[in-house]
């Protein structure tokens, strides 16, 4: 074989070998059904989840009302009141006197927050409960759900006082309401023990307390009562257009809030402050 023929034969054999190798290991080709290698499928944990809605707050079992009850246009209070005007309908004013026991005042505030019941506190200023509970009471005062009025500084019988001593009793309590809560108690004064006459009424009016507030029924709990007795008084007096007195002096009433709400529900009663009735909801008593 000539050298030239040998080289041609060798080149042809090499080309055939390379062709065979290529056939055994074909190059990969793109498959349109496969995802790109740079974009692997997202795992379930990487999927975007929708936000979980916040749960709706549940109402307290004591809940009775939201805000003031529907009321007619207010009419100015007389110089002496014992009950609410007839045209207010199924509305009662629950008023709470004294404040001997700070824990009872605190419990009344929880009752107000849980039930929505609107309360008028007649404050006897010498008791520490009115400063002890300031931080908890202040938002309720500012919202108008709780009203503060004057029940004197030391709870004396007003009919036994001179004009100067009576004015001092009112002024000291008024100063507490102003300094601690930024409000006035005027024009509502409740005389301790119900002791009043034309002289006390006129003297109170000289310092802005032009309406003496008496009552049309009481829980009777200025002193310590059993639960059965107090509940009986509540059943007797929680009626439409009544101004009813309770006292923040002993814890008995704090065990009966559920039963008091039951009475109000059974009688379709809502509670209003004196401001709601005589000035209209939203009355500003800041000074």
Per-region residue spans from a language model:
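Metal-dependent polysaccharide deacetylase catalytic core of the NodB/CE4 family, i.e.
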Residues: 91-92, 113-234, 240-245
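Residues that form or flank phosphate/diphosphate-binding pockets in enzymes
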Residues: 103, 131-132, 199, 252-255
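Short amphipathic alpha-helical segments
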Residues: 107-108, 134, 201-202, 257-258
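Non-transmembrane alpha-helical segments in soluble domains
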Residues: 7, 109, 174, 258-261
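Catalytic grooves of carbohydrate-active enzymes
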Residues: 239-275
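N-terminal pre-catalytic segment of deacetylase/amide-hydrolase enzymes
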Residues: 2-94, 101-107, 114, 135-137, ...
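Histidine/acidic-residue-rich catalytic or RNA/ligand-binding cores of hydrolases
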Residues: 224-225, 256-258, 285
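Active-site metal-binding loops of divalent metal-dependent hydrolases
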Residues: 96-99, 152, 248
């Amino acid at each position: 074989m000539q050298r030239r023929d040998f080289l041609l034969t060798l080149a042809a054999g090499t080309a055939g070998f390379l062709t065979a190798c290529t056939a055994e290991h074909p190059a990969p080709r793109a498959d349109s059904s496969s995802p790109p290698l740079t974009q692997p499928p997202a795992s379930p944990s990487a999927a975007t989840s929708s936000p979980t809605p916040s749960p709706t707050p549940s109402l307290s079992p004591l809940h009775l009302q939201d805000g003031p009850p529907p009321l007619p246009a207010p009419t100015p209070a007389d110089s002496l009141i014992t009950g609410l005007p007839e045209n207010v309908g199924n509305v009662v004013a629950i008023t709470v006197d004294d404040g001997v026991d700070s824990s009872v005042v605190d419990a009344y505030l929880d009752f107000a927050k849980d039930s929505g019941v609107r309360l008028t506190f007649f404050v006897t200023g010498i008791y520490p409960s009115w400063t002890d509970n300031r931080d908890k009471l202040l938002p309720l005062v500012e919202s108008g759900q709780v009203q503060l009025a004057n029940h004197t500084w030391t709870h004396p019988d007003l009919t036994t006082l001179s004009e100067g001593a009576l004015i001092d009793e009112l002024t000291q309590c008024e100063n507490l309401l102003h300094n601690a809560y930024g409000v006035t108690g005027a024009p509502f004064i409740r005389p301790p023990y119900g002791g009043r006459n034309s002289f006390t009424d006129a003297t109170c009016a000289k310092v802005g307390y032009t309406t003496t507030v008496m009552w049309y029924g009481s829980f009777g709990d200025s002193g310590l009562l059993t639960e059965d007795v107090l509940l009986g008084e509540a059943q007797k007096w929680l009626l439409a257009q009544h101004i009813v007195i309770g006292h923040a002096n002993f814890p008995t009433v704090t065990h009966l809030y559920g039963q008091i709400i039951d009475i109000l529900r059974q009688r379709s009663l809502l509670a209003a402050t004196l401001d709601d009735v005589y000035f209209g909801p939203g009355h500003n008593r800041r000074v």
